[in-house]
Amino acid sequence: MKILVIYNPQAGGGRAKALLPDITAYIEAKGLDATIISTNYSGHAVEIAANAKLDDYDAIIASGGDGTLFEVLNGYYQNPIQASKQNKPPIGLIPNGTGNAFMRELNLSATDWKKAIDIIAQNNPRLLDVGRFTTENKTYHFLNIVGMGFVTDIAEASLPLKWMGNTSYTVATLLKMIFLKSQKMTIEIDGKCLERDGVFIEVANSRYTGTTFFIAPEAELDDGKLDIIILNKISRLKLLRVFTSIFDGTHINYPEIEYIKARTIKVIEEKPGKLIPDGEILGSTPVEIECLHKDIEFLWD
């Protein structure tokens, strides 16, 4: 099995660099023929995946956090071989970053790189849905989630706290709660228009965000639908209670939360705000998002 591994040595606060020799040795021990390319800058994984000769490989592997997987996915969709719908290799994951939400779908932790390589060696692809969103006249793809509103404030605040690991998202949430505000949002879901005074919207393909937040407990990766979580205007005190319930998914029981499954969603905010797709700050509202049903293969356990 011939694989291309796009490796982010800066993942996990730079800890991934020290892991590379061990990961390389284990890949070889599993009998995999690997080409390993390390990324050198933000956006490099996009370029590598976009320019790779995909038909030379049996799988394309992202090794890093959710941001690395996001870049590899988007480079994959930019690749002319992928666009031709011929000889499309599956994607795989070796997690070793700070934010590793998608690995939870594979029942992996950030230290489970050996188990991840075992999964890759099994060569058992599964068809998955992919989210596609258009913002600022550009189109991107995601496997995890796109957030807007208060969640982008949290993401920005968590960046200088990445040294704290998964705790960075929790600390950032508590810090930004001081500045909590809602705003008017126009939301079109499968053609039906809603007007809301919202705090945030999350559009999820998978169940987790920020590794530990069980944001979309009913999400399925192959149902042809995205799970939309809308938090309407809420007090700081009640938001604190909602926040603590996100870890086990019971936040969806609060009346301020709307949980909707749909194929398409469009969002316009009264004051255009930034987007946070798969942990990356990229684009802004207005945004159009849709589900591409079973559009890629992903190496699964």
What are these regions (language model features)?
Residues 30, 78-199:
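Catalytic core of DAGKc-family lipid kinases
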Residues 189, 195, 220, 230-301:
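ATP/nucleoside-binding phosphotransfer catalytic cores, i.e., glycine-rich phosphate-binding loops
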Residues 45, 67-72, 102, 128:
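Short glycine/serine/threonine-rich phosphate/pyrophosphate-binding segments
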Residues 181-183, 197-199, 222-227, 261-263:
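A generic structural signal for short beta-strands and their flanking turns/coil linkers
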Residues 1-63, 74, 192:
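ATP/NTP phosphate-donor binding region
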Residues 147, 151, 202-216, 281:
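Glycine-rich phosphate/pyrophosphate-binding beta-alpha loops
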Residues 162-168, 212, 217-238:
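Gly/Ser/Thr-rich active-site loops/lids in small-molecule metabolic enzymes
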